[in-house]
């Protein structure tokens, strides 16, 4: 399969490119596109066969549900039923944005999209390219992260190309994403609503809008036998290709050990990345992949 790559500017959207990508989705194809969180692998959320193609392209188990993306709030009622009253307040504060909410699914959503569950995960992305594509495709686009299952989520179109070229129909290259972290998932089928996957929107932020929320046991107890209920949490996730080491100890010991390991790898001609906090970043002189704000 030839993968078509189209450049697109979110500040000046080319409607011809959007219509081309929308037609690919309407015909059952797969299109990778940018959202504010990560690049998503889009398919028609209301077609069972499109869901099967998504699972095949990603090498993703078919019982791992997909998130349905919408561009207009009124469309939520077409894919979800028994929507709780708190939803309006949450949507007013956090949609469009990096929040996925789980509801009871409507009959229009196939079980292929929901991973065989009677619930559906729904999000309204804020990226204008994503919103335009969703509308052009008919309003409902399922979109897990656009990567091979288990790999780190892509934040650029090049990440998608390297991983999925030849497996999907099209990539919309809208540049680097804004957040780089997948959406927070909130289960609205329980009382109080429960966080199933952490993300940019925190429990404190939810509490300011609707009061206290719960946190899924699997997030706070690594020995929990409870089955994860959210997309991306049931199977191995965020697994980089490179070897990764975790160094533990007091700060002085950690810094010394990490510098020694990095120096030894550098001497062997290897590229080195160090994940560090703002407190210790100044002590490292090698390539830094990510710096935590705390």
PLM regions and their residue ranges:
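Active-site-adjacent structural elements in enzyme catalytic cores
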Residues: 1-292
């Amino acid at each position: 399969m030839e993968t078509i790559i189209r450049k697109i500017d979110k500040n000046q959207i080319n409607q011809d490119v959007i219509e081309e990508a929308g037609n690919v989705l309407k015909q059952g194809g797969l299109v990778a596109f940018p959202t504010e969180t990560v690049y998503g692998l889009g398919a028609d959320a209301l077609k069972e066969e499109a869901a099967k193609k998504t699972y095949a392209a990603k090498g993703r188990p078919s019982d791992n549900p997909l998130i349905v993306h919408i561009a207009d709030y009124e469309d939520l009622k077409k894919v979800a039923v028994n929507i709780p009253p708190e939803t309006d307040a949450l949507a007013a504060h956090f949609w469009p944005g990096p929040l996925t909410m789980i509801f009871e699914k409507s009959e229009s959503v196939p079980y292929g999209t929901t991973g065989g569950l009677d619930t559906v995960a729904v999000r309204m992305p804020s990226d204008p390219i994503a919103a335009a594509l969703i509308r052009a495709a008919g309003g409902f686009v399922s979109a897990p992260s656009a990567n091979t299952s288990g790999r780190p989520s892509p934040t650029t179109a090049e990440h998608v190309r390297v991983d999925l070229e030849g497996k999907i129909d099209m990539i919309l290259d809208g540049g680097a994403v804004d957040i780089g972290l997948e959406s927070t998932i909130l289960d609205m089928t329980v009382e109080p609503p429960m966080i199933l996957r952490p993300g940019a929107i925190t429990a404190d932020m939810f509490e300011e809008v609707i009061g206290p929320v719960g946190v899924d046991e699997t997030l706070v107890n690594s020995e929990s036998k409870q089955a994860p209920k959210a997309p991306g949490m049931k199977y191995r996730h965020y697994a980089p290709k490179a070897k990764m080491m975790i160094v533990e100890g007091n700060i002085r010991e950690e810094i010394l050990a990490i510098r020694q390991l990095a120096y030894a790898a550098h001497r062997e001609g290897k590229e080195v990345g160090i994940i560090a906090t703002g407190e210790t970043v100044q002590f490292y002189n090698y390539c830094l992949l990510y710096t935590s704000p705390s």
